[in-house]
From Swiss-Prot:
Name of the coding gene: pth
Biological process annotations from GO: protein quality control for misfolded or incompletely synthesized proteins; rescue of stalled ribosome
The protein's name: Peptidyl-tRNA hydrolase
Organism: Burkholderia mallei (strain ATCC 23344)
Membrane spanning residue stretches: none
Record keywords: Cytoplasm, Hydrolase, RNA-binding, tRNA-binding
Catalytic machinery residues: H20
Site description Discriminates between blocked and unblocked aminoacyl-tRNA, residues in chain: N10
Lineage: Bacteria, Pseudomonadati, Pseudomonadota, Betaproteobacteria, Burkholderiales
Family: Belongs to the PTH family.
List of residues binding tRNA: Y15, Y66, N68, N114
Length: 201
C-alpha cells in the first residue's frame, strides 16, 4: 500500500512551470482530485496535506527545501507517521524518458537525479517507488550531425519551461499516471505498473 506520495520540484514562483517541477504538477493534481489543500508544514519542511484518495488515507508532500535536500522533508514525514520506504512513491522528472512517457518502478539508483539521491541517503534505502515523468533530454534538441562532442546544458534545460507541444505530452502522461493511482495506492503496485506501461506511457 502507498501511504505517502511525494512530488519533487523547487520552491518559488520562478520554478513553478519548469521541467524540474513535474513531480509537483502530479501532486497538485492529486490534491485537487481529493479536495485537499497543500499547506506549509514546517515540521515536514514542505507543503503537506492528508488526503482521502480512492478510499484510502494518503499523505501528500511537496518538499520546499530545494531539490538536492528533498530527503530532509521525506524522512521527517516518514518517521513521524512510521511509513516504510516501500510505502512511499516519489514522482519526479526523468531526463531519460521522452515527454509523454511515464514509468513506475521500485528501487534502483538515482540516475543522477539529486532529489532521489538525497532521499535515498536520508532513508538509508533505495527501496521506494518512483514515478518517472519523462521530460526529454537536451541532447535530443541537438541535430544528430552535431551531437558528437556536444555537451548539453542539463541544469539549464531542467530549469526552463517545456515547449507547448512538450507540455501537452507531459500533461497527458501525468493523466495516465493518475489513472493507475487507485491501483497503486491500494498496494497493487505491480499491476499499476503493468497498466501504466501497457497504456503507452
Amino acid at each position: 500500500m502507498i501511504k505517502l506520495i511525494v512530488g519533487l520540484g523547487n520552491p518559488g514562483a520562478e520554478y513553478t512551470a519548469t521541467r524540474h517541477n513535474a513531480g509537483f504538477w502530479l501532486v497538485d493534481q492529486l490534491a485537487r482530485e481529493a479536495g485537499a489543500t497543500l499547506r506549509d508544514e514546517r515540521r515536514f519542511h514542505g507543503f503537506y496535506a492528508k488526503a482521502r484518495l480512492f478510499g484510502e488515507e494518503v499523505h501528500l508532500l511537496e518538499p520546499q527545501t530545494y531539490m538536492n535536500r528533498s530527503g530532509q522533508a521525506v524522512v521527517a514525514l516518514a518517521h513521524f507517521f512510521k511509513i516504510l520506504p516501500t510505502e512511499i512513491l516519489v514522482a519526479h522528472d526523468e531526463l531519460d524518458l521522452p515527454p509523454g512517457a511515464a514509468k513506475l518502478k521500485l528501487g534502483s539508483g538515482s540516475g543522477g537525479h539529486n532529489g532521489l539521491k538525497d532521499i535515498s541517503a536520508h532513508l538509508s534505502s533505495q527501496q521506494y517507488w518512483r514515478l518517472r515523468i519523462g521530460i526529454g533530454h537536451p541532447r535530443d534538441l541537438i541535430p544528430e550531425s552535431a551531437r558528437a562532442g556536444a555537451k548539453p546544458d542539463v541544469a539549464n534545460f531542467v530549469l526552463k519551461p517545456p515547449r507547448k507541444d512538450e507540455q501537452d505530452l507531459i500533461d497527458a502522461a501525468i493523466e495516465r499516471a493518475l489513472a493507475v493511482m487507485p491501483t497503486a495506492i491500494k498496494g497493487e503496485t505491480e499491476r499499476a505498473m503493468m497498466q501504466l506501461h501497457r497504456n503507452g506511457a
